[in-house]
Amino acid sequence: MKFFKKFFDYEYKELEKFKKVADQIMELEPVIEKLTDEELKNKTQEFKDRLTNGEDLEGIKVEAFAVAREAAFRVIGEKPYYVQILGGLAIHGGNIAEMKTGEGKTLTSTMPAYLNALTGKGVHIITVNEYLAERDANWMGNIYRFLGLTVGINFRESTPKEKQEAYNSDIMYTTNNELGFDYLRDNMVVRAENRVQRPLNFVIIDEVDSVLIDEARTPLIISGGRIESANLYIDADRFAKKLKENDGYIYDEKTKAVTLDEKGIKEAETCFKVENLYDLNNTNLVHYINQALKANYAMKRDMDYVVSDDKIIIVDPFTGRLMAGRNYSDGLHQAIEAKEGVTIQQETKTLATITFQNLFRMYNKLSGMTGTAKTEEEEFREIYNMYVITIPTNRPVARQDYGDLLFATKEGKYKAIVNEIKERHNMGQPVLVGTIAVETSELISSMLKKAHIPHEVLNAKNNAREAEIIAKAGEKGAVTIATNMAGRGTDIKLTDEVKELGGLCVLGTERHESRRIDNQLRGRSGRQGDPGMSQFCVSFEDDLMVRFGTERAKDMLARIGFSDDVSIRNKMLSNSIEAAQKRVEGNNFDIRKNLLQYDDVINQQREYIYERRNEILDSDSIHDSVLDTFHNYISDLVSSHIMPEGYLTDNDLSEILEFSNEHLLKKDLSVEELKNKSIEEVTELLYSKVIEEYEQKLSEIPEEITKEFEKAIVLRVIDTHWMDHINTMSNLREGIHLRSYAQVDPLRAYTSEGFELYDDMLNTIDKDITMYLIKSEIRQNVERKQVIKGEAVNDNNKVKKATPKVVNKIGRNEPCPCGSGKKYKQCCGK
């Protein structure tokens, strides 16, 4: 087998390459150790000079790793082990380094981060929360500062100036959420100097599976512009609560989909007084009903969300942490609020959005590290073009992983778990109990209280003391009940006495749908060669077992007298559980892949719009571009009147003139001026007249103001239509799956119709830019004229810079600018 591995196993070949380089780095150790602190620091400038003179990162890699390794020892007293060098090389190569818990991923990242920061293009280190970002920046940051590099931390509460400084640092620590929101905000600014990011170069994502897999289905959204809909959610909720399963609605355990059956459809039509529920005019009603069904029958309180202070707070299904400030999209959050009887927030309009999949694929080089990635390596390779390299442990793993204990019922399982905890607690062995849901952790806690066993509970309702609770979880006699949140971030360290007692005992109360999450729980025990054990207890009533049909096995065991309190350890049943997990993982991968295919459609559009915005912001003047827009619009205007035979009739010319004289020109053109002219000549004549009047208007205004004026109008038009387009695409996406009933591929239909909508949007943008710029007047006061001349000063004797005041001429039949939706003549123009 080893012979075949040498030729066909990518991971094996990469590790062999890394070992050769790691040997060279280790050989340099005696030389680097002899350098003084000053000589070691000077190496950074030497490396930068060599890069400037044409050498590449591969040429300085061995020396740079050796320097970073020695600096770590001098600054924090820790020198990366040989296996950590291997991990660092995997990360530098744009791979994922899979390193077991306690193997020192944080220290491992310092070597590739230092090497890549030498280019001056910036390195971003992403963590899952701000606590870890600050901890790692303060801890590892001292190594980089010692070597002459700058280190920044980007927080949610940082000011724009602080964010700019952080992004301009050689190495920046931040969270995946803040990175994404900064990207979206940068593409909404109206001045170039307000952007905080620079081009995305190299990123190291800590807990990469959490960011790129678990959160891949959750888009980042910046929203605004409120929509009134609270009563509709209440009405839909009332209706949904009247229905019964299989007698009004159907619930699919495997997919968690809830749909109306025939009876439910008829009841909906009666309740809401509509003839045909699925008529196109009832699209919104169907949406509210569907969300109410999902809220009431698929979303579980204290598992998917908690209710706190009149608010619905989402529970992260993979970490168990509360996600304050996050809302379910598409009205599901409001539907849950209606279900729970809390205040219903107003729905908002999406202003900007992106998925983590497309955000991180914008980096020149993407890498990561985690303890659990191997089960998802196909997805990492296919979506992100990253390989998972499993790094050997520094010491052999001494933890004992036992096969699953299977019980008939949950009640029997929980009793057995409490008895096991009691036995281990009496021995003094620390126990970590892993649960999936808040309600399970609270149930186990109440049973332990009755048994008079002291313990700590760590769940979404009680996460303020997370670091403290986890740090003490390895003490003698400690019993800790935790949701999945205990899986990341803080090591559980053991005393010698606890090691003698067998180390940390990990008990899982049920299998998660992802093997990776189970492996994370196991990995809390047995760090760096410590002793320990792990055991999962499952029952036929667990969600995973119910979803994947284990009724036949349950019946068989019942026939042979398998009672509630008896457990069995059966390899065949354990394999069937793992097979069920693989099916769920495969299904989830397909969902994420499908999401990406749809998101790629709007991502191409987003890239063009954002590129156009940045060109506008970075240009000194966009006047030539504005004139091109005028020409495009006038050309489209004329083309839209051309007869199929390829000419313009007198009637067509009259229509073009009527529109032009009313909307584009102050000085009217006559039909005679256009008669007997070719289509190109008509276009050019109209264009020349529009330009003549427009240039005349601008000639009366100082050049600096006209530059600002054009930029402000163009950006406002682009942003307005782009935001509308995002919501239009979202609406298209919501119903596109119905096309499959007509034998039409939904993705192909979404792509085709999405680009038609996009083309329409671009044409509308050209039209509105033309209209706004031609119709707008710029008023300036005396102070503004003085500003342009550099004369106006404020109390501190500094020149003031004001923004141009733009006033639009509004036609009486145009929408009122107050946002009421009425015509101007029927609203503010009365």
Question: In which residue ranges do the predicted regions lie?
Answer:
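Active-site-adjacent structural elements in folded domains
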Residues: 109, 417, 801-803, 811
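Generic detector of short, well-ordered, non-transmembrane alpha-helical segments enriched
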Residues: 376, 429, 477, 605, ...
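Extended, charged helical/alpha-beta scaffold domains that provide interaction surfaces
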Residues: 32, 306-313, 319-326, 528-529, ...
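Short Cys/His-rich zinc-binding micro-motifs
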Residues: 806-825, 829
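Hydrophobic, well-ordered secondary-structure elements that form the walls
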Residues: 433, 481, 722, 758, ...
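Short, Lys/Glu-rich amphipathic helical modules
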Residues: 428-441, 618-619, 671-675, 817
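Conserved P-loop NTPase motor core
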Residues: 1-561, 610-611
